[in-house]
Amino acid sequence: MNYVVKELYIYPIKSLAGISVESAQAEEMGFENDRRWMLIDEENQLITQREHPELSQFYPQIKGDEMEISHYDSVHKFLIDESLDEPVFSKVWDDDSKVVEVNKATSRWFSKELGFSCKLVKIINKGDRKHNSSRLNQTLDVSLADAYPYLLIGSESLDQLNEKLKEKITMQRFRPNIVISTVVAHEEDFFDTFQIGNLKFKNAKPCGRCVMVNNNPQTAIVSKEPLKTLSTYRTSNNNVYFGTNILCL
């Protein structure tokens, strides 16, 4: 069966708002400029929407060789290729990650906007963060995504969920990279190796969801949905699944 790509997204800075794009350069580590940056605290620990839902109100845009971040009335810019020389060692969950700070001015801006000290850091080289996938029994070169380089969701999966919810939600809750048009809910779970254009992809594993999907990206208000409803029909092995993680071969 042929599937149509409906939407493409990148999330340049981990846990900040995403960008809808018409096209994207696919790489082994994920789409170009997708989750290549992240915020860390004074102990070099990852900062996410799980603890700071207000991160959803920071909106990045890539304009030529610059990244522009808007947060309400405040705007900050930095060069995409900009970074300091000194390496910083952090973690993305259980994975050691070698990153570098973008610049001091950008870190100060984020610290001021968030109200606590933090740094914006960037992963530079392939191999600076590796993820050991027990599911695939292999080590993956990944950017700063949670575990896998791409997230695929079928349109009917969201349509089915919205039929069960009192208030409909958008696909942005689930932060996919690729949204395809489907006719059967969650049929993407059962893909093996498949092709989009000239690119071959492999299904890695269904995506287990956390409380972050309960954060409304338009308002930064956290509720019990949609995780509460999803848990009634998408739970397996104590995880709630929505969408599937994929690799570009």
Q: Can you describe what each PLM-predicted range is?
A:
Residues 1-249:
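Metal-cofactor-dependent catalytic cores
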